[in-house]
């Protein structure tokens, strides 16, 4: 049995390395939407994760990006998901408020998940639908002609529908998932010959768990995102879990920067996380810092097993 588990762990690690190499070869540039703590709530990276905590789960997150820069992005997020119909289905919802410069965008999405269970793993399929509301505060643009038709159009909030689909495979040692969002490419028209559009986004997430002793483990994970039009982003992370309570880790975002993170199981129901990003690259005239905070709550007590494995 021990030999079988060793072979399984090696095969799992090899699969993760192969997936990571695929991601890094395609990574080219950073895109706008970024989170550094997706490992602690995979629902952020892949909606098919909904219900995986086997109880009602809530999470809030705040991110301040490139602090000290005028008009820098910031984001607030609330998510909730729960299993339904035993463990064969799940439902979830995310509400995200993004701000960058004069633009504010509010996104609300609902997710339905169906799960196929195997002996030691499961495959989840998700469909997501929601609305995206966007508005531009013209007063922050310092425009010379405040009566310009285009500016008046920008100042009006508009909402459009959005749909997506996801698939996620999980076992006790491995997770691999693919997500596609904004598939309908909805757009806004602010004035004649002027507008914007939600481009399709695709993401691939993968991770492997490596036990290193009783109550301790190492998690290696990677996330690659592609935005229609040629924008790529890939990142690689490693975390160490100490005594089933404290996560300490870091990561590298290709051609963008490094990050450090700390998470703590405050109780069997409550967990918190904090990350710090140090960004460098051709797109920055000087180094920039970002901070992200995370707080998650599960309605029922999570077992040591479920706490250890993402």
How should these model regions be labeled?
Residues 1-2, 309:
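Generic detector of intrinsically disordered, low-complexity segments in short proteins
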Residues 2-15:
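Bacterial N-terminal signal peptides that target proteins for export
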Residues 30-310:
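Subset of outer-membrane beta-barrel
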Residues 12-24:
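Bacterial N-terminal signal peptides
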């Amino acid at each position: 049995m021990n030999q079988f588990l060793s072979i399984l762990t090696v095969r799992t690690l090899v699969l993760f390395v192969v997936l990571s190499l695929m991601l890094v070869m395609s990574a080219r540039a950073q895109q706008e939407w970024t989170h550094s703590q997706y490992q602690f709530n995979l629902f952020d990276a892949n909606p098919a994760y909904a219900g995986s905590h086997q109880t009602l789960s809530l999470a809030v997150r705040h991110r301040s990006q490139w602090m000290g820069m005028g008009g820098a992005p910031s984001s607030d997020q609330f998510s909730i998901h729960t299993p339904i119909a035993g463990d064969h289905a799940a439902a979830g919802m995310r509400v995200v408020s993004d701000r960058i410069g004069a633009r504010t965008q509010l996104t609300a999405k609902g997710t339905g998940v169906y799960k196929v269970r195997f002996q030691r793993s499961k495959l989840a399929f998700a469909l997501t639908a929601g609305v995206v509301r966007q508005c531009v505060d013209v007063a922050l643009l310092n425009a010379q002609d405040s009566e310009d038709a285009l500016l008046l159009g920008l100042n009006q909030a508009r909402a459009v529908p959005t749909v997506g689909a996801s698939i996620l495979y999980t076992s006790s040692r491995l997770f691999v998932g693919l997500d596609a969002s904004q598939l309908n490419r909805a757009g806004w028209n602010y004035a004649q010959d002027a507008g914007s559009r939600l481009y399709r986004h695709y993401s691939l997430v993968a991770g492997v768990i490596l036990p290193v002793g009783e109550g301790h483990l190492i998690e290696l994970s990677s996330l690659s995102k592609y935005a229609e039009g040629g924008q790529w982003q890939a990142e690689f992370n490693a975390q160490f879990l100490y005594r089933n309570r404290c996560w300490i880790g870091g990561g590298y975002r290709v051609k963008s920067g490094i990050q450090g993170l700390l998470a703590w199981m405050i109780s069997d129901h409550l967990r918190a996380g904090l990350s710090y990003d140090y960004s460098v690259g051709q797109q920055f005239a000087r180094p920039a810092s970002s901070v992200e905070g995370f707080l998650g709550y599960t309605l029922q007590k999570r077992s040591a097993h479920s706490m250890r494995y993402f």
